[in-house]
UniProtKB/Swiss-Prot annotation:
Belongs to the CYYR1 family. The chain crosses the membrane at residues 62-82. Keywords: Membrane, Signal, Transmembrane, Transmembrane helix. Residues 30-61 are extracellular. InterPro entries: CYYR1 (IPR022640). It comes from Homo sapiens (Human). This is Cysteine and tyrosine-rich protein 1. The keyword Transmembrane applies. It is found in: Membrane. It is a single-pass type I membrane protein. The gene is CYYR1. Residues 124-154 are annotated as: Disordered.
């Protein structure tokens, strides 16, 4: 099933675009009744302020959209460049899973670890705290703390 299509009328879009440019040109350049806010003082028919018109069109949202679009396109280009560089690098090396003999010789040339006679972690260390005893130790004879300097009782 085909989706319903709009009737195609050739030659409709072009006249509308021409009318748009004609009216936009009038408002941009001439001081008519529709573009008084963009006009400056002067006698020439072309006295509209292009900067005011452009500033009105390019609001903060439009500028933010343009900046976001440029940053997005730069990110896409950077991602493509990284992919291309990685593919070029991978094609220069050998295939995955095949090691070069120099790498194998380098790994096998290192000496093995020394033999272990006993487990070093199980050695008794003299710095261990005393074992736990359930009987409480006697109270330590301590002197009372010094009096608080701000509260003197009389």
């Amino acid at each position: 099933m085909d989706a319903p299509r709009l009737p195609v009328r050739p030659g409709v879009l072009l006249p509308k675009l021409v009318l748009l440019f004609v009216y936009a040109d009038d408002c941009l350049a001439q001081c008519g009744k529709d573009c008084k806010s963009y006009c400056c003082d002067g006698t020439t028919p072309y006295c509209c302020s292009y900067y005011a018109y452009i500033g009105n069109i390019l609001s903060g949202t439009a500028i933010a959209g343009i900046v976001f679009g440029i940053v997005f396109i730069m990110g896409v280009i950077a991602g493509i460049a990284i992919c291309i560089c990685m593919c070029m690098k991978n094609h220069r090396a050998t295939r995955v899973g095949i090691l070069r003999t120099t790498h194998i010789n380098t790994v096998s040339s290192y000496p093995g670890p020394p033999p272990y006679g006993h487990d070093h972690e199980m050695e008794y260390c003299a710095d261990l705290p005393p074992p736990y005893s359930p009987t409480p130790q006697g109270p330590a004879q301590r002197s009372p703390p010094p009096p608080y300097p701000g509260n003197a009782r009389k």
